[in-house]
Amino acid sequence: MIIEARNIRKSFGSLEVLKGVDIAIDRGEIVSIVGTSGAGKTTLLQILGTLDRADSGELRIDGTDIMGMNNRKQAEFRNRRLGFIFQFHRLLPEFTALENVMIPALIAGKSRKEASCEAERLLSDLNLSDRASHKPSELSGGEKQRIAVARALVNHPAIILADEPSGSLDSAHKEELHALFFRLCREMGQTFLIVTHDEKLAAGTDRILHMRDGLLFSE
């Protein structure tokens, strides 16, 4: 198992959002989590991605005990091993597409030359080489989200965590992005965990998990 979590609990004040969640994901799987708004999907994704801490429970990612790490160690692990794609691209407006993709690699300690070469390779693979010098304001919605995908991939993460990744796109760009996810999983062997309301995207994944009342169900 590349992700294994047991009895994950999380409360905000008196509101218990996660009530003892168990989840296990194999390497190379694409798994979707669906459910109504407020069911706890994003909270769970943030905990699995080390962006937030559970109140209690166990979490191992690729054999590493995450709960025992301090914040600095978690941040280092996150930048090396995990990639994130959000509904809104979160590109830095003052930087070019190429520079946005390079940022996680630079944070990981790679040289500027190495980061640039890898970012250029990814942009080429995603048919975005001609947009490398453009800033986010000069890109379409679909292009910005593909730049965000390249940024998520630049450190060769074992796992990609995506929260409503196509929620802000039109139908044509959604189809394009979904096809890209499946291609990456097939060609690069990466594991994808996707929170989505998009029934078509969920239907194409290896497994669909349903979140209800703070718990996960496989149906």
Curated annotation (Swiss-Prot):
Pfam families: ABC_tran. One of its GO terms (molecular function) is ATP binding. Keywords: ATP-binding, Cell inner membrane, Cell membrane, Membrane, Nucleotide-binding, Translocase, Transport. Its EC number is 7.6.2.-. It is found in: Cell inner membrane. InterPro entries: AAA+_ATPase, ABC_transporter-like_ATP-bd, ABC_transporter-like_CS, MacB-like_ATP-bd, P-loop_NTPase. Residues 3-219 form the ABC transporter domain. It comes from the Bacteria. It is a peripheral membrane protein. It is an enzyme of class 7 (translocase). Its main location: membrane. ATP binds at G35, T36, S37, G38, A39, G40, K41, T42. GO terms for cellular component: plasma membrane. Part of the ABC transporter complex LolCDE involved in the translocation of mature outer membrane-directed lipoproteins, from the inner membrane to the periplasmic chaperone, LolA. Responsible for the formation of the LolA-lipoprotein complex in an ATP-dependent manner. Belongs to the ABC transporter superfamily. Lipoprotein translocase (TC 3.A.1.125) family. PANTHER family: ALPHA-D-RIBOSE 1-METHYLPHOSPHONATE 5-TRIPHOSPHATE SYNTHASE SUBUNIT PHNL, LIPOPROTEIN-RELEASING SYSTEM ATP-BINDING PROTEIN LOLD. This is Lipoprotein-releasing system ATP-binding protein LolD. It comes from Porphyromonas gingivalis (strain ATCC BAA-308 / W83). The gene is lolD.
